[in-house]
């Protein structure tokens, strides 16, 4: 009997050893050891984030966002697949990180000593602060002592720790932590006048202002703090070391700067009147032209084409400038003839020709310019001509920059209006500063359309879910009554 028992124990030990050899990550996931090895064995990197217009979102059925693109590049360097895990708030994110169910938390997370004690942290790659947001045209408090109504925050214990410290200075400070709504949803409720104040990340407030200009910033709650990725706490530093090397390389190669330009560059510019007018136009004018933008988009995103048209004419088919350009895409007579259209004020002809002209400009660019950046170069040419774009690229090279990099060329565009520079260029003087602002505006307008529709879709999804829940509750009540 004793021999049988020993044989059973031995067999079980061999079985567990075999399972561990075949599926080692099943054990490693739930320990603090060999986390980097577990990722390699699993073949995928689990990154937790929050769905919003900066960190992560779905656009045209593909994943986008600052944190997504940076995480994808990191996964590529590790030689593994990327799998994004989406959470509603930071506490859900940190809870899963603490359980080792994700490998990284990446959602523009501000540094906090409490979190630094609980987790490993990656290198700083940006900065932000906590701000008090209120609704424009309401009384603006000067400090926390002036706040007389409810302050709302999302589920964020680190922020609560900060507020508890501030409470020593402002004893009357009270806040409400909403565990049901995301930070973005709280800001949207604030914009609609449903709640009076929200404390949120400065990056998220600036992003939401692009589609909800009613939002205003009262003051900073904290000084700017570094933004980091957080990793599970572990005696092993392999993953943290790999992340440090990756971030250093991302800084050196310009990847970080390019992502900041792509996702954060446009949100630094905010004009209440312009944004309010634009959002009204998106709601009331764009729907009548969006089918045409979609029809003639070609290889472009139709929302970019729409943004170009708004920058050109504010979606006015009869627009005319003193220089003779006309129509919703503001085409010159020569461009109209080149694109073979007869009536520049006909919206369909104008949009078709404008799109074809943009595609033609893109085709004239050297192949050395990356696909994703080619449109920005083409827009400069659309605004001030292909010759001046050639000059801007040549000037960038002369000044030691990369003529194929949009960030490098962009900063030199204003120099086309300075005599010491344009006098040495083939095509001479150009209002390069206007071309610079032209592209910036279009990027901002496009992102606003994307995020306006994203918010609308999310609200529709939430409304449908609430309706289904209400119907289910009614059915349960009816069953109980029967």
Swiss-Prot record:
Signal peptide limits: 1-18
Keyword Glycosyltransferase carried by entry: no
Pfam families membership: SBP_bac_3, SLT
Region (Disordered) residue spans: 457-482
Composition skew (Basic and acidic residues), residue ranges: 473-482
Membrane topology: Peripheral membrane protein
Single GO molecular function: peptidoglycan lytic transglycosylase activity
Matches recorded under PROSITE patterns: TRANSGLYCOSYLASE
Active site per UniProt: 312
Disulphide connectivity of cysteines: none
Main subcellular localisation: membrane
Location of the region described as Non-LT domain in the Swiss-Prot/TrEMBL record: 19-267
Subcellular location: Cell outer membrane
Classification via CDD domains: MLTF-like, PBP2_YfhD_N
Chain segments carrying region LT domain: 268-482
Any one of the GO CC terms: cell outer membrane
Catalytic activity, EC: 4.2.2.n1
Domain notes: The N-terminal domain does not have lytic activity and probably modulates enzymatic activity. The C-terminal domain is the catalytic active domain.
Protein name from the UniProt record: Membrane-bound lytic murein transglycosylase F
Organism: Haemophilus influenzae (strain PittGG)
């Amino acid at each position: 009997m004793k021999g049988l028992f020993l044989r059973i124990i031995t067999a079980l030990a061999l079985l567990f050893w075999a399972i561990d050899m075949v599926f080692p990550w099943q054990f490693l996931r739930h320990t603090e050891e060999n986390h980097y090895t577990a990722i390699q064995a699993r073949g995928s990197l689990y990154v937790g984030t929050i769905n919003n217009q900066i960190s992560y979102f779905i656009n045209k059925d593909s994943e986008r966002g600052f944190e997504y693109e940076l995480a994808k590049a990191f996964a590529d360097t590790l030689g593994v697949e990327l799998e994004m895990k989406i959470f509603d708030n930071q506490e859900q994110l940190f809870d899963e990180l603490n359980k080792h169910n994700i490998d990284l938390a990446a959602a523009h997370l501000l540094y906090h000593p409490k979190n630094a004690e609980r987790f490993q942290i990656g290198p700083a790659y940006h900065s932000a602060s906590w701000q008090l947001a209120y609704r424009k045209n309401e009384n603006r408090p000067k400090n926390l002592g002036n706040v007389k109504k409810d302050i709302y925050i999302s589920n964020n214990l680190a922020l609560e720790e900060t507020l508890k410290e501030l409470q020593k200075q402002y004893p009357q400070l009270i806040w409400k932590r909403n565990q049901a709504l995301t930070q973005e949803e709280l800001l949207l409720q604030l914009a609609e006048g449903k709640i009076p104040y929200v404390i949120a990340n400065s990056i998220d407030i600036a992003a939401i202002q692009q589609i909800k200009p009613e939002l205003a910033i009262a003051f900073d709650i904290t000084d700017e703090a570094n933004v980091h990725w957080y990793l599970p706490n572990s005696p092993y530093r392999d993953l943290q070391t790999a992340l440090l090397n990756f971030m250093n390389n991302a800084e050196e190669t310009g990847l970080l700067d390019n992502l900041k330009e792509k996702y954060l560059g446009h949100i630094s510019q905010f004009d209440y009147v312009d944004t309010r007018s634009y959002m009204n136009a998106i709601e009331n004018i764009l729907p009548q032209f969006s089918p045409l933008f979609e029809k003639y988009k070609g290889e472009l995103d139709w929302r970019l084409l729409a943004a170009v048209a708004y920058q050109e004419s504010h979606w006015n088919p009869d627009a005319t400038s003193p220089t003779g350009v006309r129509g919703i895409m503001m085409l010159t007579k020569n461009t109209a003839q080149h694109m073979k259209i007869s009536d520049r004020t006909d919206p369909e002809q104008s949009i078709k020709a404008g799109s074809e002209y943009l595609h033609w400009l893109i085709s004239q660019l050297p192949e050395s310019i990356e696909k994703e950046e080619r449109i920005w170069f083409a827009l400069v040419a659309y605004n001030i001509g292909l010759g001046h774009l050639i000059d801007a690229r040549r000037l960038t090279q002369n000044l030691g920059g990369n003529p194929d990099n949009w960030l490098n060329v962009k900063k030199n565009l204003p120099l086309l209006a300075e005599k010491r520079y344009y006098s040495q260029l083939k095509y001479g003087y150009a209002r390069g500063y206007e071309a610079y602002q032209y592209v910036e505006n279009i990027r901002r307008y496009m992102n606003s359309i994307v995020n306006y529709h994203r918010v609308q879709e999310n609200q529709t999804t939430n409304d449908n879910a609430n309706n289904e829940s209400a119907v289910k509750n009614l059915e349960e009540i009816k069953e109980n009554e029967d």
